[in-house]
Structures are given as C-alpha cells and as structure tokens.
C-alpha cells in the first residue's frame, strides 16, 4: 500500500516507475532445455500439490508459456500468464493463452485478483527481476487463498 501523503512512499514510487519503464525487459526466448526443465518441475513439485483443475493459476513472468502449455495439457483450465515482454505476449497468445500485460508485482482487483482469490502462483526465475521483492511477495500473499502454494 502506497501512502500518497508520505513523501518517502512517493519517492519510492517515483523510483520504481522510472526503473520499470526504463529497465530492459528480460526476454528468455525459446529453449528446449527450459521447456524440459519446466515440465520436470511441474511433474515433481506442482502436480503433487493437487491444485483443483479449475483453480485459478497464475504464471508470473511467464516467458514463452512453457508452464501454461504443460499445465493445459494436464487438464488445468483457468491459467493466466503475466509478462511485459512483447515477444512473450505474442508467443503465448498464439498458443491461445490468457496473458496480462502488466508488472507482476501488482495484481489489480479490476482483473479479478481479489484477496484470497488465487489457487496457485508459479514464478520460476521471475522474483529476482522485481526491484522490491518483499512488496511483490506481500502482493502474492494477498491474492493467494489460505493454504494455497507458490513455486
């Protein structure tokens, strides 16, 4: 929560916005190795969590959509990727995925990200790209349902 009456919060917000709109957006590109590793992670760590097949699942910093592709193959239906990379957006949308084009640190309520509304968050190799990871994690804690997991 940013307090607009607090000068320090405004300075942080200004810094963050400048960083966000001038920083290079990490574009992973396509990689058979990353695709294979993503499938292994899903098989070993995600599927055993028994996430409901119709549960709301987010892939934050989704890259070219390997997680989204494989989860759809496993029968999951409510999948959303979040990225700022135009190349990744194109690849994911070409595969029929729902993609949100905004900063993964802020999940807007107008898009349905209410308190305790998400069943699972996947953010492999994404959190390190947040300038304020503690705020990002607080946001994920806000939207995750009680007892839900994040990888």
Label each residue range with its predicted role.
Residues 52, 131, 145:
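Short conserved AdoMet
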Residues 134-149:
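A short glycine-rich, Lys/Arg-flanked "PGG" loop and its adjoining helix->strand segment in the class I
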């Amino acid at each position: 929560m940013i307090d607009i009456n607090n000068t320090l919060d405004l300075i942080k917000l200004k810094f963050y916005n400048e960083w966000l709109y001038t920083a290079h957006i990490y574009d992973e590109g396509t990689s058979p190795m990353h695709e294979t590793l993503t499938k292994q992670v899903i098989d070993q760590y995600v599927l055993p969590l028994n996430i409901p097949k119709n549960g709301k699942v987010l892939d934050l910093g989704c890259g070219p959509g390997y997680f989204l592709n494989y989860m759809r193959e496993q029968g999951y239906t409510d999948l959303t990727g979040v990225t700022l990379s135009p190349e990744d957006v194109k690849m994911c949308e070409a595969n029929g995925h729902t993609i949100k084009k905004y900063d993964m640190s802020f999940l807007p309520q107008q898009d349905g990200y209410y308190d305790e509304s998400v069943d699972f968050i996947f953010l492999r190799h994404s959190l390190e790209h947040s300038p304020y990871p503690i705020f990002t994690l607080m946001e994920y804690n806000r939207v995750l349902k009680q007892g839900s997991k994040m990888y």
